[in-house]
Curated annotation (Swiss-Prot):
It comes from Methanocaldococcus jannaschii (strain ATCC 43067 / DSM 2661 / JAL-1 / JCM 10045 / NBRC 100440). GO terms for biological process: ribosomal small subunit biogenesis; rRNA processing. It catalyses: AMP + ATP = 2 ADP; ATP + H2O = ADP + phosphate + H(+). This is Putative adenylate kinase. Interacts with uS11. Not a structural component of 40S pre-ribosomes, but transiently interacts with them by binding to uS11. Residues 103-113 are annotated as: LID. One of its GO terms (molecular function) is ATP hydrolysis activity. The lineage of its organism: Archaea, Methanobacteriati, Methanobacteriota, Methanomada group, Methanococci. Pfam families: AAA_18 (PF13238).
Length: 177
């Protein structure tokens, strides 16, 4: 079983995935790290300081791990595009995402692009199949993990519970060159 933990950078995917791994003993694949470490990309986008993923190579890499593991967690903002059986979409207040990404040293253009992606529900809209959406804003990690475990256990589905468009509409009209 493939469980995708997806969402805009800065929502808490890696933190949540690590706690799930520790509590459930499930193998976690950090998509970003795997892409870099095993060169599962076609090129590096210098302007956005990111990699253009070779999805065919990445899928093959995941298939090999999945043959050995009963269940795996795919941690990454593109994990929902990797044929998961179940998708957890983490959401977070755009202002908090902005702070986190700036602390990580993201370029202003990349920060804005990710804030806009969160406001526009990009990861949620791209997620197909069994999807469960969670707002992580100001929530305890253990509480979030408890909710995820319950959702997976009972195959719960929930979409459209978070909407940042009205409150943060102004971010959508900004442009950084």
């Amino acid at each position: 079983m493939r469980i995708a933990i997806t969402g805009t950078p800065g929502v808490g995917k890696t933190t949540i995935s690590k706690v799930l791994r520790d509590r459930l003993g499930i193998k976690v694949i950090d998509i970003t790290e795997a892409v870099k470490k095993y060169k599962l990309y076609t090129e590096k986008d210098e302007d956005m300081d990111s990699y253009v993923i070779d999805f065919e190579k990445l899928e093959k890499f995941i298939d090999e791990i999945e043959e050995k593991e009963k269940t795996i967690i795919l941690d990454g903002h593109v994990s929902h595009l990797l044929n998961p059986d179940y998708i957890i979409v983490l959401r977070c207040n755009p202002e908090i995402i902005k702070e986190r990404l700036e602390k990580r040293g993201y370029k202003p253009k990349k920060v804005l692009e990710n804030i806009q992606a969160e406001i526009l529900d990009v990861c949620l809209c791209e997620s197909k199949g069994k999807v469960y959406e969670i707002d992580t804003t100001n929530r305890d990690v253990e509480n979030i993990v408890d909710e995820i475990i319950e959702a997976i256990k009972h195959k719960k589905e929930r979409k459209g519970v978070v909407d940042w468009t009205e409150k943060y509409f102004d971010y959508l009209t900004l442009e950084i060159k």
